[in-house]
């Protein structure tokens, strides 16, 4: 560092918010409102079929200490939508402070949302606090997946220091349907070789299907949980299906996630997943 280079904690922090509202107009799902500011963007690519696709993007290229990022999607009554992220999110060394990500989606009565963000990659000394909430109206449902990768195996990265807190929850009528907290820190990483933590694995994902018929999808989901290099299990109860996956690296995990999503959705993944 020299006189022309400010210390890391003095650098400007990234802030962004993107919000999309969909509504049914004359029998079709239409964009009713779009608001975006700072580093957060949202766009609706042209798709084949009646279900719109929303792609959220963090233009800052990654997250570091003090950054603030939020995405919000409102899916109107009787509407269906698919939402994802343009690419994997990366949390870099934090310096001072914690990066915060807030995802808040709402699905109106009888609606449906596929929330399919691409994986989050955590780097050494990263500090990230993320909260994802999906609020379901009466008769609404959703499919949600979250994947986390601890460093890049291809680059020989092994993490020993980070602070990651992740809370995912789905509610209906003010009551929790699913609550998934996850916390990883230096102590957890030091114990990560143990079977009770990660068993030496470095990529993990949780998939949740909530809605009518979710329990019926247990058999088809289990039938494809055979990707080499991935440990996975599925269970179904109380109107939801849960699939948990662990892998040595992000690539086999991504392939397994894509296969399960293919079975549950019955159609191709968003194009950004395929690029």
Swiss-Prot record:
Function text: Required for maturation of urease via the functional incorporation of the urease nickel metallocenter.
Protein name per the record: Urease accessory protein UreD
Keyword Chaperone recorded: yes
One Pfam family cited in the UniProt record for this chain: UreD
UniProt keyword terms in alphabetical order: Chaperone, Cytoplasm, Nickel insertion
Subunit structure comment from the entry: UreD, UreF and UreG form a complex that acts as a GTP-hydrolysis-dependent molecular chaperone, activating the urease apoprotein by helping to assemble the nickel containing metallocenter of UreC. The UreE protein probably delivers the nickel.
Top-level taxon in the UniProt lineage: Bacteria
Gene Ontology cellular-component terms listed: cytoplasm
Organism annotation: Cereibacter sphaeroides (strain ATCC 17025 / ATH 2.4.3)
GO molecular function, one term: nickel cation binding
Similarity remark: Belongs to the UreD family.
Localization terms from the record: Cytoplasm
Keyword check for Transmembrane: no
